Curated annotation (Swiss-Prot):
Keywords: Chloroplast, DNA-directed RNA polymerase, Nucleotidyltransferase, Plastid, Transcription, Transferase. This is DNA-directed RNA polymerase subunit alpha. It comes from the Eukaryota. In plastids the minimal PEP RNA polymerase catalytic core is composed of four subunits: alpha, beta, beta', and beta''. When a (nuclear-encoded) sigma factor is associated with the core the holoenzyme is formed, which can initiate transcription.
């Protein structure tokens, strides 16, 4: 097994929306550098989640090629500026933001009214200018996702009068890696892996690498317990293995994890003694935490908790 160290050799914040980090991983066996570098690059660029504005409603506007009286930018320019807005969301459900402003004024993201689950990374990010005493009203929907979300231009079918925006959720804007060989002896060659990460400020380069590694761990973890035995025994043995898994493998939020621990729920076996309704009876365990646990069980282990506890007559 290879044990390596990772060191951050350079870190800088060029602006609220630009962070950079350079890292070195060493020592690696020959061939491991490209394996790690390529896996991290693909995962970090495609799988890390971010937040973006996906739809907008502007008072008095019915299509994206309109102009707004008293506003310097037309609707299309405003949509393009909103597409660049960098956000961080602590909610998996869509959120609504708003602004109502009378001019003359400069509209920046710092003037947006957003739920507490949403963090605006750059409050000075420019959106538009109101040139006279026009009242500008706008609502926008924020969603969480990964990669790109390309949509057909036009109104959002989910909400009347909402114009859709092509959303870019990727928190990492660029990722480079290089591998350098180091000859230790005539028969031993080790490698040094250099990583360069650029982010949009919604997370740091260090966080990006950590989250990317967690995604890869979750992806490969099921392969660590392969056991091809008699098909008749497979289901029972799989169930026993699952029951022994600790709740740490669900990668829950700190709040949900602590509530389960205080309720003496330490393993999946303990958790399966509860129904969805019974989870809500745990002290300080709200609907949001229950939904998080239910989703984690389904996505990571393929287990669906019953809505209610089955009561069998004895």
């Amino acid at each position: 097994m290879t044990y390596f160290q990772i060191e951050c050799v350079e870190s800088k914040t060029e602006s609220n929306r630009q962070q950079y980090g350079r890292f070195i991983l060493e020592p690696l066996n020959k061939g491991q550098g490209i394996t790690l570098g390529n896996s991290l690059r693909r995962t970090i660029l495609s799988d890390l989640q971010g937040a973006a504005i996906v739809a907008v409603r502007i008072a008095g506007i019915n299509h994206e090629f309109s102009t707004i009286t008293g506003v310097r930018e037309d609707v299309l320019e405003i949509l393009l500026n909103l597409k660049k807005v960098v956000l961080k969301s602590h909610s998996d459900t869509p959120q609504i933001g708003r602004i109502r402003l009378q001019g003359p004024a400069i509209i920046t993201t710092g003037l947006f009214e957003v739920p507490p689950e949403i963090l605006i990374i750059d409050p000075q990010q420019y959106i538009a200018t109101i040139c006279n005493n026009t009242i500008f009203e706008m609502e926008f929907r924020i969603e969480k996702g990964s990669g790109y979300k390309l949509v057909n231009k036009g109104f959002d079918k989910k909400s009347i009068d909402f114009l859709q925006i092509d959303a870019v959720f990727m928190p990492v804007t660029k990722f480079n890696y290089t591998v350098e060989e180091k000859k230790i002896s005539p028969i031993l060659i080790q490698e040094k892996l250099f990583l360069e990460v650029w982010t949009n400020g919604s997370l740091s380069p260090q966080e990006a690498i950590s989250e990317g590694a967690q995604v890869l761990h979750s992806l490969f973890y099921p392969l660590t317990n392969l056991n091809f035995q008699n098909a008749n025994n497979t289901d029972n043995e799989y169930e026993e293995e699952i029951n022994q898994v600790l709740i740490e493998e669900l990668q829950l939020s700190v709040r949900a994890y602590n509530c389960l621990k205080r309720a003496q729920i330490n393993s999946i076996s303990d958790l399966l003694d509860y129904s969805q309704d019974e989870l809500l009876e745990i002290k300080n365990f709200g609907q949001k935490s229950a939904e998080e646990v239910i989703e984690a069980l389904q996505n990571k282990l393929g287990i669906r908790l019953p809505k209610e506890k089955n009561i069998q007559n004895t």
